């Protein structure tokens, strides 16, 4: 499995789809899909029941593929790469203009 640089709670930028150009917070994450707050909103119809005698329509965020989002740092979409230090720690590294800047540790790696 490829290492993912996106975690729940991160701010992301939408690269493709109907909501292209929007930003939002990651609500949930699976292996290849993310649910972003306020993005890819779908309307779901709830049938009539004893609790809802008239029925209702609710808005939910549908998942989008992880390749269609990019992590934002300081309000700009950022590409991250993995760097292995001399101690064997793996770090996410940001390269906005050719320079390297530490972003955070790769999840699950201790050192």
Swiss-Prot record:
PROSITE patterns: RIBOSOMAL_L24. One of its GO terms (molecular function) is structural constituent of ribosome. SMART domains: KOW (SM00739). One of its GO terms (biological process) is translation. Coiled coil: none annotated. The keyword Ribonucleoprotein applies. Keywords: Ribonucleoprotein, Ribosomal protein, RNA-binding, rRNA-binding. One of its GO terms (cellular component) is ribonucleoprotein complex. It comes from the Bacteria. InterPro entries: KOW (IPR005824), Rib_uL2_dom2 (IPR014722), Ribosomal_uL24 (IPR003256), Ribosomal_uL24_CS (IPR005825), Ribosomal_uL24_KOW (IPR041988), Translation_prot_SH3-like_sf (IPR008991). One of two assembly initiator proteins, it binds directly to the 5'-end of the 23S rRNA, where it nucleates assembly of the 50S subunit. One of the proteins that surrounds the polypeptide exit tunnel on the outside of the subunit. PANTHER family: MITOCHONDRIAL RIBOSOMAL PROTEIN L24. NCBIfam families: rplX_bact. Part of the 50S ribosomal subunit. Belongs to the universal ribosomal protein uL24 family. This is Large ribosomal subunit protein uL24.
